[in-house]
Amino acid sequence: MNKAISDLSSHTPMMQQYWKLKNQHLDQLMFYRMGDFYEIFYEDAKKAAKLLDITLTARGQSAGQSIPMCGIPYHAAEGYLAKLVKLGESVVICEQIGDPATSKGPVDRQVVRIITPGTISDEALLDERRDNLIAAVLGDERLFGLAVLDITSGNFSVLEIKGWENLLAELERINPVELLIPDDWPQGLPAEKRRGARRRAPWDFERDSAHKSLCQQFSTQDLKGFGCENLTLAIGAAGCLLSYAKETQRTALPHLRSLRHERLDDTVILDAASRRNLELDTNLSGGRDNTLQSVMDRCQTAMGTRLLTRWLNRPLRDLTILQARQTSITCFLERYRFENLQPQLKEIGDIERILARIGLRNARPRDLARLRDALSALPELQQAMTDLEAPHLQQLAQTASTYPELADLLQRAIIDNPPAVIRDGGVLKTGYDAELDDLQSLSENAGQFLIDLEAREKARTGLANLKVGYNRVHGYFIELPSKQAEQAPADYIRRQTLKGAERFITPELKEFEDKALSAKSRALAREKMLYEALLEDLIGHLAPLQDTAAALAELDVLSNLAERALNLDLNCPRFVAEPCMRIEQGRHPVVEQVLSTPFVANDLALDDSTRMLVITGPNMGGKSTYMRQTALIVLLAHIGSFVPAASCELSLVDRIFTRIGSSDDLAGGRSTFMVEMSETANILHNATDKSLVLMDEVGRGTSTFDGLSLAWAAAECLAQLRAYTLFATHYFELTVLPESEPLVSNVHLNATEHNERIVFLHRVLPGPASQSYGLAVAQLAGVPGKVISRAKEHLQRLETTSLPHEQPRAKPGKPAVPQQSDMFASLPHPVLDELSKVKVDDMTPRQALDLLYTLQTRL
């Protein structure tokens, strides 16, 4: 990091100016505008050269020291900024604001913008499919206030959360690229370990000043209308976010219009492990392929894709909203109405982010062209929505209004294919502004004037070799060969002498030069002024335009879910008051799409008579797929979507937990088993009788007895909690749980062997598995044949010595547990087993002594 420089007297004037600005941004890279380049100095230069793979050089000396320097062309800055932002860096943009021609000493410069990962809005720096969120948190271990802002859409929300576990789960859900925390928090807290964590001064979180700034931003007297007046911690966090956004953008933020109070009670909570295991929008390798989002997303707009991702990551418990979405999807499916709407939506584009850039006053000409095209497409879109009877769709259609005046304004203002930036002009149409037209005409018609002037002067002077030209140094000129220069008329004023030629200027040419050269700069200045005025005009309509964008995004998601329902054979789930989870012919929506063979659908029934299924069967038999598909079906139902099942009936759940697969947490110093136990502990502490719990192979990472004991106790606890539980295990001993826990049942995934090869049937059947097929799976995996043969010998010996003599008795109506060897259990010695069955009271002393001698010979 750079160190602040307090004594600037020994530095050059340029470096004095640099350090006055740099001292205010020591922990951020500074791009310092020098002509056509952004130059980067000192420690910033060393860091940037390494990160951007550009040459590190030096720029003279200051204060007796060489100045490390690297630079990038200002017109190519976007690519470099994108790379730095992806690496988590923040960049201060320092521009020249003075005129080099009139400046005495260094040209005036000032910081015009600070680009941070959470406050970027440039299209080139953003992932169009993901929200770009920044969050701030305030509180202690008991209660936290969390504020979340998406500056690229204007979405601003607050909530209060109890405890670290819930806070970390929420941070995992929103996945902010920056997280602001108070500087007076102790070092090393869990939140600080997240990427993008930045400390801010404690007074940035002060409640009263935060309340005041929020009320000013939203033009309200208080925050009661947003339902968060009494959320002291959340208001403090929101105030910090607003301050940070203003600090980085250096402009007003008119697109931030309201604050939404979110409540965890309204949502189905998934912890970090569950989100990871279910691969909602990121797979276990960190990519997007073969995720739920990749299968469910055929949205026509980027803002629709982002909204769908938000829904998948925040399933709801509000029946009114869920049923309104179901009704909307059903309406779209009738007569395939979604097919009429989707092509129209595709014309809309990502106006949500375009409107945010307009609010930030950094919208580019192509943004306005896309907004023009979107507004022009709205009337036809409205026509496509006229026959939608669902009340929610009618409400969305009404909100997605038309804007004929704005569409006409942009049609008149912006050329069909504008340049990327306003910098060099050429954006506004001819006829939009008369003064601009005159200035551009004067500038653009200079060539014809020079042609006409040359012809007139040749005729007037009789000098056939006379030429009229222009260069950037000397401006316009009349050129004569040296031999003819003496014949120049008296009104020719010598301007430049060349080898073999003389150049002149005339009063007429000088007058034209003054007009033409200034016309271009004046035209560019006026075009920029008109462009800024156009942005201000659009800012005045931001509120309804943002409402329209939100309505169109939701229409996109709902029509997309209708298309998915049709093409993926999804059906509408039914929510009921009775506690239950009944799925007929359920399928895994992702696995089904990647299989080359038909997916085997399976049923599930959990209710007040059965709350837990103990699932046994071979590896690769489909246990994990069956469990995950249940969670995904339940989750899709709770976003209002149709689900991959022939039918589905369920009550609302409050949480979805998964304990499926673990790996070492090396950075945190935790083993695989420790990670597994931490996840299990979280489930046992927080699951309720409304939770869905998936437990896969609990207890694998320790000794057999320890693992079995922990798995058994955890299963008993969940059964007694009455959580909806799918408990997959290879501990065959757990199949006796139904004998002691009446809400537990056994099911298994079946398989068969043919010619010493295993065939997985993937069908879920009642009762426990009859055998594990472990050796067959090992053979399928390519374990050497001699190892398999030796394993069979060991297995035969273990089965001979370890089979229990008596199986537990089945309860009436429950299938008997089949006999299966337990290759890990340490069962009693046969002598001890026989001795335990002897009825000593029925024996004579002589019989007892004879038995003792007999048993002794068997030891």
UniProtKB/Swiss-Prot annotation:
Keywords: ATP-binding, DNA damage, DNA repair, DNA-binding, Nucleotide-binding. Residues 799-821 are annotated as: Disordered. One of its GO terms (molecular function) is ATP binding. PROSITE patterns: DNA_MISMATCH_REPAIR_2. It holds the Pfam family MutS_III. It comes from the Bacteria. GO terms for cellular component: cytosol. One of its GO terms (biological process) is mismatch repair. The keyword Repeat does not apply. ATP binds at residues 617-624. The keyword Calcium does not apply. Belongs to the DNA mismatch repair MutS family. NCBIfam families: mutS1, PRK05399.1. PANTHER family: DNA MISMATCH REPAIR PROTEIN MSH1, MITOCHONDRIAL (PTHR11361:SF34), DNA MISMATCH REPAIR PROTEIN MUTS FAMILY MEMBER (PTHR11361). This protein is involved in the repair of mismatches in DNA. It is possible that it carries out the mismatch recognition step. This protein has a weak ATPase activity. This is DNA mismatch repair protein MutS. It comes from Pseudomonas savastanoi pv. phaseolicola (strain 1448A / Race 6).
